Amino acid sequence: MSIEKVPILGKETIHVGYGIADHIVREVIANLASSTYVIVTDTNMARTPQYSKLTDDFKTNLSEKRPESRLLTYCVSPGENNKNRATKAAVEDFLLQQGCTRDTVILAVGGGVIGDMIGFVAATFMRGVRVVQVPTTLLAMVDSSVGGKTAIDTPLGKNFIGAFHQPEYVFCDVSFLETLPARQFINGMAEVVKTAAIWNEEEFTRLENFSKKFLSVVTSKKPDLQSIKAELVKTVLESVRVKAGVVSSDEKEAGLRNLLNFGHTIGHAIEAVLTPEALHGECVSIGMIKEAELSRYLGILPPVAVARLSKCLVAYGLPVSIDDKEFLKKVGPKRHYVEIDILLKKMAIDKKNDGSKIRCVLLEKIGKCYQLKAHQVSKQDLSFVLTDEVLVHPFTNPPKENIIVPPGSKSISNRALILAALGNGTVRVKNLLHSDDTKHMLDAVASLKGAEISTEDNGETIVVKGNGGNLVTSGEELYLGNAGTASRFLTTVASLVGKSQASDDVILTGNARMQERPIGPLVDALGSNGSEIEYLNKQGSLPLKISAGNGLKGGRIELAATISSQYVSSILMCAPYAKEPVTLALVGGKPISQLYIDMTCAMMKSFGIEVTKSTTEEYTYHIPKGTYKNPSEYVIESDASSATYPLAFAAMTGTSCTIPNIGSSSLQGDAKFAVDVLKPMGCKVEQTTTSTTVTGPPRGHLKPLPHVDMEPMTDAFLTASVVAAVAKGGSSTSITGIANQRVKECNRIEAMVTELAKFGVPANELPDGIEIHGIDIEDLKTPEISKRGVSSYDDHRVAMSFSLLAGLCKEPVLILERSTTGKTWPGWWDILHSKFKIELDGYEPPFNTDKHVDKSSDKSIIVIGMRGTGKSTLSEWLASFLGFKMLDMDKYLEEKLGTGIKSLIKAKGWEYFRQEEAIVAKECFTKFSKGYVLSTGGGIVEGEDARQQLKSYADNGGIVLHLHRDLDETVTFLAADTTRPAYSSEVQEVWLRREKWYHECSNYHFYSSHCSTEDEFNHLRRSFVNYIKLITGAERPVVPAGRSAAVVLTSPDLNEVVGDLESITIGADAVELRVDLFKDTSAEFVAAQIAVIRKHADLPIIYTVRTVSQGGKFPDENVDELKSLLLLGIRLGVAYVDLQLTAPNELIEEISSKKGFTRVIGTYQDINGELKWNNVEWKNKYNQGVSMNADIVRLVGKANSIQDNLDLENFKKQNTLKPLIAFNLGSQGKLSQVLNGTFTPISHKLLPNDEEFLTIGELNQTYFDIGGFTAKKFWVIGSPIEHSRSPNLHNAGYKALNLPYQFGRFEATDVDVVYDNLINKPDFGGLAITMPLKLDIMKFATKLSDAAETIGAVNTLIPIEGGYFGDNTDWVGISNSFIRAGVPPKSSSNGLVVGAGGTSRAAIYALHQMGCAKIYLVNRTAAKLEELVKSFPKDYNLEIVETEQQADKASKVSLAVSCIPADKPLDGEVLKKIERILSNGSEQSAGFKPTLLEASYKPRVTPIMKLTEEQYKWKVIPGVEMLVNQGDRQFKLHTGFTAPYEIIHRAVVEE
C-alpha cells in the first residue's frame, strides 16, 4: 500500500492512496485517543462495500486497541438540499443524546455535503471537537475536505454560515471513487483542472493528455479504475498539493487563498440558481470559462489560453456554457431562472467580496493568476461576458490611432494543419487561429491518427508530428459544427484513410446549417476517382459516409469550381497521395477565388510538393506523387478577412488603424481590401509588403463605389457593405462577383439586405452581388430592440460587420449571438472594448419557454393510409387550414404516365406500378417539398424504396400522417368504388399486411370516426383541425392558469359509456384516458378509443399508462411495450402524455426528445402512503420532474391524517418552478384534492371506481364550503333586456357546475348607475353588456383585450387586480358559430358583412381572425362604411360595395354575416347587392359550403336567412348560435371554468 503525504499548515495530515482503509483506521485509533468515535455518512454511502469495510475494520481494531472506547454511526439524507440548519441540528441532537463529550472524534465520510456540514458540527459541538475528513468523491478530495472550511447552506445562498475548523487528518482513499457515478466523477475534475490552471502549467498539460483515457474509463459500463490507478492518484495528489500550499500561506482567506476561487464567483452564482439539478463542478466549469473570457475581455489573458482551458474542460465532459446541450438536459426549464440580475445579486453577496463590490480571480496565463489576488470587476463587464446578446453603444470618442494584430488566418491555419498531418516530421505552427473551426480540424486530425499534436509556449505554439499520410478510421463520427473549410478539406482527406478494427468508414457530420451547405461537386469529383461516398441525409450536403481503404486513383480529375475554391484546395492538398500523379482540371467556367487556389499551391511548395500549372489547358494543374516534408517551423499569417474589420472601423470613424503583419505580399486575396475598396471610397491607404494602414476621411464623408468586383476577396464583401451603407453620394455602391456567398454560413447577400434595412439603408440583391444605396450617417435608424435588434444568422462575419455599423447609430444597437465570432476571431469584442474603447453591454432577451420547439414551417405534409379512410377529404381540410396546395399523387402519376392506374396495372402488373409509384414519390417529395399536402396511394408502403423515402422524410423533421378508420366502414366504402382496381385479397388481409409498414413509415396517426350526420361530420372536421394545430405547433396546449379539472375515464371500453360522455365531461377542462385500464392496448384499439373521445368531446386529452407499481394495471416489466404505447400517444396528437418518473432513464429521454408539441406530465405516485410530505424524497421527485423538462409535475401521495394534507400545502408553496398537480388519495385525502389547482382529477357516478375522486359538483361545493369560492353576482346590463337569454345561459352553467353564483338582469342606460349599484359592490363578479352601454362602459376598463380595442366596444367586464378588464366576445360568438357549422378556423376565402353598426365591427374582426383574404361591406348608407373602413388596419383588406356593378365584380364569397335589424324589411338596393354576391358564392368553395350567420336571434328565421338558404342554397346559422358561443367565452372569462356547452345551448335554444 503506497501512501503519499502532503503537508498543510506545518503538518503532514493529508494522506493520499488507493485502498487505504486499514491505514485510516490505524492512524486514527493510534494518534487520536477518544472515548467516542462517531462516523457520520449519508444513506447512499452507507450502502457501499468501501464504507462497510471501513466501519468493520474500525470496530475490529477498536476492540483490540481501545476496548474502552465506543464507535457510533449516524446517517443523514443525501443531497445538497439537506446541507442545512435542520440536518445539522439533528446530528447535534444525536451526539447529545448519546452522551458525547469534548474528547469525541468525528469522522466525516462522504462527499462535500458531508464534509462541509459535519465539519461545521465538529467546529461548534462542545465549542469544537476533533474531526477527520474521509472524502469519498473526487470533488471533496481535491476541494472541500482540504483547508478547514466548514459550512451549511441557507435559502439566500451556499455556505453562508460556517467556520474555519482544520481537520486532524484528511484521508483521500481513491478506491472510494469506484462507487462514484460517472457524472459525479466528471464533476470533480472541474476543481482539478482549476488548480492546475491557476498554479501549475505542467500539470495542466498532463491533464490535457490524460482526458481521453480518463473519460473512456469512467463512462464505461463497468469502470476499471485499476487501469488508471496511478494517473488517478497523481491527479488527486497534484491538485491537493496546490490547495494545501495555498492554504498554508493563507489559512483564513485574507488574500492568496482567494485564488482558489477562480471560476467560483460566477460558478457559485449559477449553482445557487440551478442546484440541485446542476452540480458544483459543472457550474464552476462554466464559471471558469466566463471568468477567463472576462480576463481576455479586459486585455489580460491571451485568446489561446481561453481556447485551451475550454478544450480541456470539454475533453473531461464538462460544460463550458449554460446553453451546453447536455447541461440543458440536466437543468431543464431552470435555465429560465439564470438571469443577469439574479446572478449579479448572488455574486454581490459572495463571501470573498469587499462589501457589495464583486471580486473575481483573473487568469494571466495557464498556470498563473493576474497579480496573485482577486480583483474588483464592474457589473457591466460581468453582464457582457454572461450573455450572448450585446448592446453596442455609439462610438463617441475612439482613439485616433490604433495598431491591431488579428488572429491567424483561418484559411492558412486549416491548410497548414492538413499539410502538417499528411507530412513527415515535426513542425511547430505559430500564430494558429484558435477558433471553433480549427478546433474541429485538430480534433479530426487527432481522431484519424493523422498526427501527434501537442502544445508549447503556453499553448501559443502547436506542435504537429505528422504520420506521412498514414491515417486510419476511429469508429467515431467526426463532428465539424458549422466549419465549412474543415468539412471540405476533410472530405478528401477521409478518402485517403485506411481501415482499422474500429470501423470500415469515416462519417463527417455537422450542425443543422452545415447539413444544408453544398459539397456535391467535390463528392462527385472524388466519386469519379475511386472514392465511395454516401449521403446520409440530404443529397449534396453533410453528413457523409466515406468508405475507408479505397484511396484516390489519381490521373485526371475534373471538378466544378465556380461555387467554392475550397473544393479545389481540398483535392490539391491530397493529390500527392493518390496512386498516380493527378491532373486537376477545373471545369464549368472561371474558378471562384483564384487567389485562394494560388495560396494552396504556395503552401504546398513550403511543405515540399510543387504544383505546376498547365501551359496547354486553362485552369488545369499537375500534381506529382509524393509525401510532404514538414518544415521545422511554420508561421501563420494574420487573417486578412478579419483585418478588414478594424480597417473599416478607421474608415467609418475618421481614425487611423495599422495592421502590422499583412501587406501587399500576402497570400490572401482579402489583403487588397484597403487598396481596392477603402481607398476609392475616400480613405488614405499606406501599404508596404508587410503592413497596411488606413486613415478614414472625416466622419460622414465616405464616397460610394459605383462598382467593385470582389471575386478575389468574397468574404470581405460584408465589411464593404456596411462601409457603403454610410457612403452617400451621387450613386449607389454595387458589389459583384460574390455569388458564392449565398451558400456560406447563411445566405450572406440576403442577410445583408435584410439587416441593412433595419438601419434604414436600402439595398437589393444582384444576380451575383448586392447594391447598397448609402445614406447620411445622421439618418441611420437604430434597429428596434423590441424586434430583436440585428440577427447574426450564427455567422461570424455578419456579426462583426454589423458591430461596426451599430456604433454609428445614435442609440445602442442589439446584436444577437455575439459568440459566433469565435469561428475566426474569438476576441473581436474584446478588441472593440479594450483597443477601440467602445462601451458594450450584455443584454438578456425575454425568455420563451417553448423556444426549444420550433413551430413547423411550410414543409409539406405527406398523408398515407388505406384506400377509403378519408385521405382525400381530410387532406383537403388539412391543405385548407394550413394554406397549402393539395396534390393527389395517384392523379399526378396518371398524368405523368398518361394512363389510369387501373389500366396500368392491368397492362403491366402490380410490380411495375409499385416501381413507378416509388419514382413518383421521390420526385414529389423533392419537387413539392414546401407548401403542399401530398396525398399518397393506399399501397405506397408496399414498396421498399417508397418506405425508405417516407421514413427518411419523417426522420428529417417532416410530417408523415397516417390516416385510418374502422375497417368495416372502409370495406363498405371500397365496395362502391369502381375507379380503382379491386384488391386481390380481402381488405382485412391487406390491412394486416400493411399495418406494421404504416406505423413504421409515419410519425403521426389520426383515426377518424364514422360520421352519419352533418353535425358529426362538422365535429370531425373541428377535431381534425385541432389535431393538426397540435402536431404542427400552430397551437400548443396551454397549462391552465386557474383552477382546472380533468375527468378520469376508467372504462375498459369507452363505447360502453359513449352515450353518457356529454354528461361525464361536464365541468372538465381535460379528459384523462387511463390506457392501462383498456381491455385491449393494441395500437388500433387505442386509436379508436381516442377517436371516440374526439367525436364526443372538444377537450384536451391526458394520455396515461399507469404501471402496477404506480397503482395501475400495466405490467412494469413490459418496458418496450410501454414505450410503444407512449410514443403512440404522441403520434395520436394528444395534448398531454403522462410519463412516470419511475420509468427507465432511456425511456424518459426518448419520450422527452420525441414529444413534439405534446406536453409531458411527469408523475410519481406513492401508492402505499410510505412518504410524508416533509420527506426529502418528494422534493427529489419534484426536482426530477423539473430536470427532465416536464411541463407539469404530478405527485400523488396517500393521506392517513388531516395533517398530511396540510403538509402537502406547505410542500406546494415551496415548489413553484413548474406547474404542480399534487394531492393525496384515500378518504382522508379528499381535502387535498379540493385544494389542488391544476387538472384536479374528478369522477362521475356513471364511471367505474367513481368513489376514488370527487365529482365536479362535490369539488366545487366543498371548495366553496371551506372558503375557496365566494358567492358572486353577475349581470346583463343595457336596455331593453327583459328578453335577454344571458341569465338562462349563465345560470344553467352555474347549476351544472355547482358554482355559488347568480346571474341577473339590470336595466340601465347610464353606466354610472351601473357602477354605483353593481360594480362597486363587494360581491361583484362581472357584467355582460349590451346596447346602449358597450361604448360608455369602456371608461371603467383599466385594461382592454386586443379585440375590444380593435372593435371599439366592450360586452364583457370583469374585476382584475387594480381595476377592471374589458373584452368583446361577440367576435368569438361569430367565429365559433362558423367553426361549429363546419367552417375551418382558418380559411383564405372572402367574406361579406352586411350593416355598419357595432356588431358589424365584431363581424369584420372575426372574419379577419378566420383568415379572410378580402372582406366586402354592404350597407344602406356608404358614409358609415367609410368611417368603419378607416378605423381598421389596412391589412384587413376591406372593400365597400356601393353599386350592383361592383357586386358583380366581387370575388367569390364563402362567409357572410348579417348585422342589420331583422324586424324591418330589407332595403331594396341593399338586397340587390347582397343577392349578386350570394349568387357568386353559391358554388362549393374552400372545402366547405358557403355559410351565412344571422347576428339577430329574433325572429328565429329572418328574411335574409330564408332568401340565402332557399334561393341561393347557402348554409345558414341562426343568431341564437352566436349568442350561445359568445356566452360560452363570456362564461369562461367570468368564472375561469369551461362552460358545459350542451347545457347552456339547451338553456338558450329550448327556452
UniProtKB/Swiss-Prot annotation:
Sites where the protein binds Zn(2+): E191, H264, H280
Where are the annotated segments for EPSP synthase?
392-838
- Positions that bind 7-phospho-2-dehydro-3-deoxy-D-arabino-heptonate: 127, 143, 149, 159, 191-194, 243, 257-261, 264, 280, 351
Q: Which InterPro entries match?
A: Aldolase_TIM, Aminoacid_DH-like_N_sf, DHQ_synth_AroB, DHQS/DOIS_N, DHQS_C, DHquinase_I, Enolpyruvate_Tfrase_dom, Enolpyruvate_Tfrase_sf
Quote the record's binding site residues for ATP. G865, M866, R867, G868, T869, G870, K871, S872
Q: Which GO terms describe its molecular function?
A: 3-dehydroquinate dehydratase activity; 3-dehydroquinate synthase activity; 3-phosphoshikimate 1-carboxyvinyltransferase activity; ATP binding; metal ion binding; shikimate 3-dehydrogenase (NADP+) activity; shikimate kinase activity
Q: How is the cofactor bound?
A: Binds 2 Zn(2+) ions per subunit.
Enzyme Commission number(s) from the entry: 4.2.3.4, 2.5.1.19, 2.7.1.71, 4.2.1.10
- Annotated region Shikimate kinase: where? 858-1048
Which subcellular locations apply to this protein? Cytoplasm
Q: Where is this region: 3-dehydroquinase?
A: 1049-1258
Residue ranges of region 3-dehydroquinate synthase?
1-379
What domain of life does the UniProt record list for this protein's source? Eukaryota
**Catalytic activity entry:** 7-phospho-2-dehydro-3-deoxy-D-arabino-heptonate = 3-dehydroquinate + phosphate; 3-dehydroquinate = 3-dehydroshikimate + H2O; shikimate + NADP(+) = 3-dehydroshikimate + NADPH + H(+); shikimate + ATP = 3-phosphoshikimate + ADP + H(+)
**Region Shikimate dehydrogenase, annotated ranges:** 1271-1551
So where's the catalytic machinery, residue-wise? E253 (proton acceptor), H268 (proton acceptor), R1194 (schiff-base intermediate with substrate)
Question: What GO biological process term is on the record, naming one?
Answer: amino acid biosynthetic process
Q: In which pathway does it act?
A: Metabolic intermediate biosynthesis; chorismate biosynthesis; chorismate from D-erythrose 4-phosphate and phosphoenolpyruvate: step 2/7; Metabolic intermediate biosynthesis; chorismate biosynthesis; chorismate from D-erythrose 4-phosphate and phosphoenolpyruvate: step 3/7; Metabolic intermediate biosynthesis; chorismate biosynthesis; chorismate from D-erythrose 4-phosphate and phosphoenolpyruvate: step 4/7; Metabolic intermediate biosynthesis; chorismate biosynthesis; chorismate from D-erythrose 4-phosphate and phosphoenolpyruvate: step 5/7
Do you know which CDD domains this protein is assigned to?
Answer: DHQase_I, DHQS, EPSP_synthase, NAD_bind_Shikimate_DH, SK
Where NAD(+) binds, per the record, is at 42-44, 80-83, 111-113, 116, 136-137, 158, 176-179, 187
Q: Which cofactor does it need?
A: Zn(2+)
Assembly description: Homodimer.
Q: Which family does it belong to?
A: In the N-terminal section; belongs to the sugar phosphate cyclases superfamily. Dehydroquinate synthase family.
Q: What does this protein do?
A: The AROM polypeptide catalyzes 5 consecutive enzymatic reactions in prechorismate polyaromatic amino acid biosynthesis.
Name recorded for this polypeptide? Pentafunctional AROM polypeptide
The encoding gene:
ARO1
